[in-house]
Amino acid sequence: MAPNLRKSHPLLKMVNNSLIDLPTPPNISAWWNFGSLLGICLTTQILTGLLLAMHYTADTTLAFSSVAHTCRNVQYGWLIRNIHANGASFFFICIYLHIGRGLYYGSYLYKETWNTGILLLLTLMATAFVGYVLPWGQMSFWGATVITNLFSAIPYIGQTIVEWAWGGFSVDNPTLTRFFALHFLLPFMIAGLTLIHLTFLHESGSNNPLGIVSNCDKIPFHPYFSLKDTLGFMLMLLPLTTLALFSPNLLGDPENFTPANPLVTPPHIKPEWYFLFAYAILRSIPNKLGGVLALAASVLILFLSPLLHKSKQRTMAFRPLSQLLFWILIANLFILTWVGSQPVEHPFIIIGQLASLTYFTILLILLPITGALENKMLNY
């Protein structure tokens, strides 16, 4: 009998083991769809980004008008740009839900997968930041100025690092050119990291909602989950196209319709919505270095999740107290996101400070204590 090419060919064999014959727990819910959705987001962003890069000019005098030209004169340029801009938002929605799933169901106990995932998040954040600077509108320019300036809080070498990153003494042409180069490069780095992420995941196999070992009961990925993922793709691409076609500027800042002007500061400098929670934490500390450290900690704290897991059960499925804390944490993140979009004045300052304190308290203190308490209650 002729050998099955899918199982014998060196390249097809890898695809087969990752996407076709992959043994998968039969009870994974729709929360496990977000990994593949992130893959679709990345593919969409790289394709639309490539098409946009063909019409973009990385020069301070031409960047703004080259984006306007793309939207007005290039065939479907407006659509490509709208999908790319809003695709970034969907990318972050998916990655935040994906991380939330990981925290709820204890997926962080696969340490290598979890750590590469956090590196992916950091790379995605860097990509989105440098990408936001490229249209060279007011918020692009001032966002770049404010965020890069944070590095000057690093003692002794800070100012040198900032000027080195800028390529001068302010955000100018060299900054824009290098940000374009980085924005082109980083998505491919994300793609590479994704392969590492998947390699680690396939070492252990997927977690499942019960948090128990499912080696005795697995089903092939195709056709069961390939079909389920296809449904997920449609359910994500539908709102994405709806947003891109009907309300493409809903999530953007009106300030970015004004070309960058170093002499006029916008009344409220704020990042895109997906960075607002971290921005609120940054602003809640009235000291530059302290704020920068809190900003870094707000994301890097995820690295500690495996160490802070004190429960004998893996998931929160059967732990009502931890569930309550988890959902308070989610509500808290919404509050931080809202506060980040408000001006720095009373009552937003105190709300932001309380929400920031609550964020770190829940993750560092309350969740581990609750895990240990639940062990005690269940006589573990």
Swiss-Prot record:
Entry note: cofactor: Binds 2 heme b groups non-covalently.
Annotated SUPFAM superfamilies: a domain/subunit of cytochrome bc1 complex (Ubiquinol-cytochrome c reductase) (SSF81648), Transmembrane di-heme cytochromes (SSF81342)
Protein residues bound to heme b b566: H98, H197
Gene3D superfamilies assigned to the protein according to its UniProt record, in alphabetical order: Cytochrome Bc1 Complex, Chain C (1.20.810.10)
Binding, heme b b562: H84, H183
Cofactor(s), names only, from the UniProt record: heme b
Function: Component of the ubiquinol-cytochrome c reductase complex (complex III or cytochrome b-c1 complex) that is part of the mitochondrial respiratory chain. The b-c1 complex mediates electron transfer from ubiquinol to cytochrome c. Contributes to the generation of a proton gradient across the mitochondrial membrane that is then used for ATP synthesis.
Protein name, entry field: Cytochrome b
Native species: Fregetta tropica
